[in-house]
Amino acid sequence: MNEKLTISVPEAARRLGISKPSAYALARRADFPAFHIGERIVVYAAGLEEWVKSQAEHKKEVSA
């Protein structure tokens, strides 16, 4: 198991192609797969992909 379970918020920003401040704003949302370990915010790596898919599905439903 070489894949990390969690990634940093800046890494999530890089993967999503958004700014770090935007990623930190997402991390404060209840539906985003981020949580605190001590004072550090981390993102559940597998959950990030699922979150992106759910956002894409939601956009399709809204525009239909």
What are the residue ranges of the model-derived segments?
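Residue-level detection of the helix-turn-helix DNA-binding "recognition helix"
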Residues: R28-R29, K53
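A short, Lys/Arg-enriched interface patch at domain edges and termini
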Residues: G47-A64
